[in-house]
Amino acid sequence: MDGLATPRPEVVFPSGEQRPALGLGTWRLGEDPARRASEVLALRQALDAGWRVIDSAEMYGNGGAEAVTGQALAEAQRAGLARGDVFVVSKVLPSHAGEQAMQAACEASLRRLGLDCIDLYLLHWRGAVPLAETVRGFEQLQRRGWIRLWGVSNFDLADMRELFEVPGGKACAANQVYYSLSQRGVEFDLLPWQRLHQMPLMAYSPFDQGALVDHPLLHAVAQRHRATPAQVALAWGLQQPGAMLLPKAGNALHLRHNWAAQELRLSADDLAELDRSFPSPRRKSPLAML
């Protein structure tokens, strides 16, 4: 890759806490016991390489992804990694978003993760439980010391505004949504609103389910920088203020390539060319979800 090393991008949470803008997603991990050892190894390699944000959920692999994450964290800590250096994110299902059900769900997640406290606990998507009750549940978990921060996922702007009207709702620390170079709908109103409130937008599927890595334009831009199309997709996202990207944990080669994307700085001409093929939205559209 061309160019000098650049500072690794970070995001700032409403509390002022700073964390890396590049983290690891764990969707599809923990689904097959036959892959357990290789998945734990991949996460261990990521932690050894410097990755410090891991995103999981009770839904992923029916708790299996949290178990894989927990085993990798335990092994890394035995090797000397400090717990406080890793920012662990998990999510509660909407069906568990009531006060009592959330306590049980969080306790189970903590057990699978092998942790005393989750750094950021998200409502995976909005369900039938009133937001006020969900916020009270998050606050109870904070008082117990089981979570540090709480947030939401797959919330559009109207949902965020409604959340902010709920007592305690303004303590929301983040919103995780589907966002990439080819899925830019949130730029119309949600992303600017979150920037205004200094609330990171956590982006899942930054390769748009792999579609971007096959796009001819990303191949052309990558060739100019002696990079890969995946690195171009990540570099674009990392240059969007307030965005934290969560590519899925893969094999060792993919981990190295994704990590190196932090060193790639796209030029103004690169960004303009990408904008022409993947323009920012001019009107409101329904929130994209996976």
Feature locations, PLM:
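A short, structured active-site edge motif that brings together acidic residues
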Residues: 82-96, 120-124, 154, 177-179
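Short, acidic/polar
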Residues: 33-47, 98-113, 160-161, 186
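CE4/NodB-like, metal-dependent polysaccharide N-deacetylase domain
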Residues: 102-122, 140-144, 166
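Active-site mouth loops of central-metabolism enzymes
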Residues: 25-37, 90-100, 124
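Short acidic capping loops at alpha-helix termini that bridge into adjacent secondary structure
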Residues: 21, 55, 80-86, 116-120, ...
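N-terminal binding-site loop/beta-alpha segment at the start of enzyme catalytic domains
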Residues: 1-84, 290
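Aromatic/hydrophobic pocket-lining residues that form the small-molecule binding cavity
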Residues: 39, 69, 102, 106, ...
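Beta/alpha (TIM)-barrel catalytic core signal, keyed to glycine-rich beta->alpha loops juxtaposed to Asp/Glu
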Residues: 3, 126-290
